[in-house]
Amino acid sequence: MNPLTRVALAVAAFAALVLALSACGPAHVAGHVPKRRDYAVPDAAGQEAQAASAGSTWREGRAASMLYTDARALRVNDLVVVRIEEIADAKRSADTDLTRRSELNASIEAFLTSLDAPYALKGGATTGFKGLGSTARTERLTATVPAVVRKVLPNGNLFIEGHRVVLVNAEEQHFYISGVVRPIDIDQENGVKSSMVADAEIEFTGRGVLSDNQRQGWLSRLLGWFWPF
């Protein structure tokens, strides 16, 4: 075997080793444990499942329209696509105007008759305060997150939970949603709007270089804690 072939084989073996190690490495920017919500029914009383009558495939209390619709997510581990579109717009303003005035006049002529009138004591004070403040905040979140049916509640509603991770240029974005939906609100494409999700928890977080640069450094936070102004 000539030296050139030997070097080529060594380089190929090293490249294969690097690829194998990278394939076994984590795909996340940092260690990550998916969130799992332990949802408990707020009040299970009066929500007991109704058994179907003998020889009947229809259960009393189920929405009548569900009998004629296409197959939808109704069981544990079925998929539901949640279309998140949350818009929050809040405004607040306050105006305060306060004025206070006091005067004091006192004469000592009755005690010191030799003093002229200009020696009478007079005093006055005026205080005022005026404050004006306003705040406005607008937020919008739009995303599509597939979710899984985790539980079927006694009344037929579904507890769903979904988690989606997107990694772009060493920046990791996490979408999470969980909540309760009615089967009747799920459309023919097994999708549901986030506005129809009850007890919803929606989270959008990021990790990576961009998210780290948006955080204030520890020294700046320490100086800000000590600085009184």
Curated annotation (Swiss-Prot):
Pfam families: FlgH (PF02107)
Lipid-binding residues (covalent, N-palmitoyl cysteine): C24
GO CC annotations on file: bacterial-type flagellum basal body, distal rod, L ring; cell outer membrane
GO MF annotation list: cytoskeletal motor activity
Keyword tags: Bacterial flagellum, Cell outer membrane, Lipoprotein, Membrane, Palmitate, Signal
Lipid-linked residues (S-diacylglycerol cysteine): C24
Residue stretches in coiled coil: none
Biological processes per GO annotation: bacterial-type flagellum-dependent cell motility
Membrane topology value: Lipid-anchor
Locations listed in the record: Cell outer membrane; Bacterial flagellum basal body
Family: Belongs to the FlgH family.
Free-text function comment from the UniProt entry: Assembles around the rod to form the L-ring and probably protects the motor/basal body from shearing forces during rotation.
Matches recorded under PANTHER family: FLAGELLAR L-RING PROTEIN
Protein name listed in UniProt: Flagellar L-ring protein
Encoding gene per record: flgH
